[in-house]
Every structure is written in structure tokens, then in C-alpha cells.
Amino acid sequence: MKLSMPRFDRSPVLVVGDVMLDRYWHGCTTRISPEAPVPVVKVEQMEDRPGGAANVALNIAALGGAATLVGVTGADEAADSLARSLASAGVDVHFQRIASQPTIVKLRVMSRHQQLLRMDFEEPFATDAAALAAEVEGLLAGIRVLVLSDYGKGALKNHQALIQAARARGIAVLADPKGKDFGIYRGADLITPNLAEFENVVGRCADEGELVARGARLMADLELGALLVTRGEHGMTLMRPGHPPLHLPARAREVFDVTGAGDTVISTLAAALAAGEELPQAVALANLAAGIVVGKLGTATISVPELRRAVQREQGSERGVLGLEQLLLAIEDAHAQGEKIVFTNGCFDILHAGHVTYLEQARAQGDRLIVAVNDDASVTRLKGPGRPINTVDRRMAVLAGLGAVDWVISFAEDTPERLLEQIRPDVLVKGGDYGIDQVVGADIVRAHGGEVRVLGLVENSSTTGIVEKIRRQP
């Protein structure tokens, strides 16, 4: 499946659901209490993070989407902490505050990144369902996706009123469901239960065939547009009426903490669909996002550079032949990782030992090496009739196969000034007997804070010499 990064800044999403505060007390444990056989945690840091529906909205905002959040809280310090965190991240917050009840707080006591204890402070909210529905309806103008983030804590009382209000306006409805009655989500465009939640409703599935069959019946019974079952280490399965199931394997490189992974899935789905992505592509992006977030501690968000890097890795463009847009994204991510970008250019018509040695030396000047290759027309202009021997596609394919080369791109001009203006490498490398001021593009690179270095060439090793030698053969 071909993936690309959506324009998330075009993603207006309304999130409605159970808001909670994830509170962390971080410290270390070095002894057992003399009062009882329990560890003593010396608390060194306290941290608050938005959780539940608030985490969904925060994830959408972290991707650059326009997130609006409607939820229910108490009139207390925890609600104030949530509102501050969300507002600072750009989320438009609409809380229905109930003075007689506390904001839901999940307090986790951590010792050296290990969770020792979780304490929940909560009561089911006595929500004014009519007032909440009226507020939601007043916010639907301009929204592309409505997310129902349901943790069963009482914020969502009349699901159907919200679903029908959105559908009447052509707004897609996504629901992260809870409980045994999925009928309350009837008519939703997509629901995203995890496997345990799904089997709690349809019964245990012996294999994927049974999972798909029961999913199809559920979609038909509830008039759902689609069903996405998240399956932990087994990835996720997308089912749509009239389409074969789409199974996506898990993409986590390391699982550290699964807290909030479901929030990440539905938030990425919502942002991608609001940005115009088709559902299979949006699901694939959500799968990559989940693989990133489970490698983080606690309730967490992912950034655009993190997701972009995962997309590039998935598409095999972490290395190889790239177009300009792909290359600029790869450079941005490399710089975010603190990597130094090296650039060199040439015709590389017949790759020889001198080229290989030179490229290895160039790569040693930094962390990533870009090789820009003259296209066929420019090689002919520079080298004369009969050149190039190899087409630009073949030349780039050979270069991309070298261990020293990270990215290869072609250019149509005789010299790479235009490309250098766009790429702005940290180091420009050229081989030969040049002064630095004679290197084409040196002024451009130095104007942007880069360096220019000249490397020696391997003697008695040149493409022109090889071509002439071949032509002299009888």
C-alpha cells in the first residue's frame, strides 16, 4: 500500500467523550517500608497529562490538526490542569463542569519507569445529556470528523443523538466503544474496539476467519460503515462491507507501555480522514502511529516527524532513490535526530573503484550522504555525444546500492545550485584539485551555515579513461 503524509493542518476534528487526567508521581525505590511489606517510593517529580478523550484531542493537535474537545469534569484543580495543558497545545476546550463531582484522575506511582501502583479517583458523571448534545451540535459547523471517545464514565449518554446530528451534516463519525452494547453506536462510520472488547460483544473467535465472519454480522446488524479491530501484537484488522478484510501486522519495534495506544489509533485515523485520506491509508497510518506510541512511557503523543519517519521506513525510503519532496522530508527528520547531512554530485556514468573510495570518504564527513546525479541530457551536454553510457535510472540504482550512500536524487541542470538552495546541506563535498571557492555551490552552502570540503581523487581511475580504453579495443 502506498502511503504518504497527509496535510494534517487541514483536519478539523471534534472529540466528545470521557475526559480524565493522567497523573504521574515519578521517583525511585531503594528500601521496603518498616510499617508494612511494601516499597517506599521517594517522589522526585510530579507530572500531569491529558487522558481519555483529552488524550485523543491532544494527539490530533500534536499532528497539526484542529482539535475541539467537549467533555465533562469537576470544578476543581484537576480540571484546571487539564484545561491549561490542552489550551497550550492548541485544543479548543469546552468542559461541562459539575461542581458536586471530581474530575476523573488516574494516579500512577512510578519507580525508575516501572509502574508500582495506580489509584483511580472517579465517580460516574451525572451528565446533562441534552445540554451536552446541544453544545456538540453548535460546534459541528466546519467539522469533518466527529470522534466519540467512550470510556463508560458517563460523559456520553445519548450516542444516537450525536451520531445522527453529525450524519445529517455529512460528517464522518468514529467511535472508540466501551461495554457490551455496541448498539448505541448504530450508524457510525467506523468503530475501533480492541480484540477483548470485540469478543466481549460477539463471543470468542477461534481464528481470523471467525473474527471476520462475526465482524461482518456486527456491521450488518448495526449498519456500520466499517469496523477496525485492534489486536495488540497481532496488529489490526479492518473490515468493510463489500471489501476483503485488510490485515495489518503490528509495527512496534519495542513495546514499553500500551497506555493510550487506542487513543493514538483513533486520533490518527480521525486526523487522516479529516485531511482527505482514504480509510485503508488512514488505518495504515494509525497502525504506524500505534507502533511508535507504545515505545513511550505512559500516556503520550506522537509528532509529525516521528510519523513521517515511520512512513518513510514503511515505504523503504529511509534510504535509496528519492524525489525532491521525499528527500526534503528525510532531511528534516535527519536534522531532528541531530544528524549531519553531506552532499556531493556528479555524472557517475560507469561506477568504478575511484567512485566507491570517494563516496566512502564523503560519507565519513557526516551522518547521511546525498548523491545528486546529472540526468541524461545534462551528461550529454557536459561529456559530449555518446554519453552517458548508462541511463540516469540505472546510474542511480547502482549508487543507491552502495553502503556509503543514503539518498540519491537526479537534477536536470548542468550544475546543482538550484538543488543546493533547496537542500541546504551541512557539508558540500567535491573531489578533485579545486580550491574551495572554485567548488560550484560553495557560496550557497556557506551562506546557510554549511561547510565545503575538497577530497582527493583516486589516481588513474576515471570514467572517461575507462570509456576510451574500451573504445580502443579491437
UniProtKB/Swiss-Prot annotation:
Active site as annotated: D263
Group of enzyme by EC: transferase
Keyword terms, alphabetized: ATP-binding, Carbohydrate metabolism, Kinase, Multifunctional enzyme, Nucleotide-binding, Nucleotidyltransferase, Transferase
Record-linked InterPro entries: Bifunc_HldE (IPR023030), Carboh/pur_kinase_PfkB_CS (IPR002173), Cyt_trans-like (IPR004821), PfkB_dom (IPR011611), RfaE_dom_I (IPR011913), RfaE_dom_II (IPR011914), Ribokinase-like (IPR029056), Rossmann-like_a/b/a_fold (IPR014729)
Catalytic activity, as annotated: D-glycero-beta-D-manno-heptose 7-phosphate + ATP = D-glycero-beta-D-manno-heptose 1,7-bisphosphate + ADP + H(+); D-glycero-beta-D-manno-heptose 1-phosphate + ATP + H(+) = ADP-D-glycero-beta-D-manno-heptose + diphosphate
Ribokinase: annotated segments: 1-317
Any one Gene Ontology molecular-function term assigned to this protein's record: heptose-1-phosphate adenylyltransferase activity
Regions that span the bilayer: none
Keyword Nucleotidyltransferase: yes
Disulfide bonds: none
Annotated region described as Cytidylyltransferase, given as residue ranges: 343-474
The UniProt record lists the keyword Oxidoreductase: no
Domain of life: Bacteria
Record-listed ATP binding positions: N194, L195, A196, E197
Listed GO CC annotations: cytosol
Pathway involvement of the protein, from the record: Nucleotide-sugar biosynthesis; ADP-L-glycero-beta-D-manno-heptose biosynthesis; ADP-L-glycero-beta-D-manno-heptose from D-glycero-beta-D-manno-heptose 7-phosphate: step 1/4; Nucleotide-sugar biosynthesis; ADP-L-glycero-beta-D-manno-heptose biosynthesis; ADP-L-glycero-beta-D-manno-heptose from D-glycero-beta-D-manno-heptose 7-phosphate: step 3/4
Known function: Catalyzes the ADP transfer from ATP to D-glycero-beta-D-manno-heptose 1-phosphate, yielding ADP-D-glycero-beta-D-manno-heptose.
Listed name of the protein: Bifunctional protein HldE
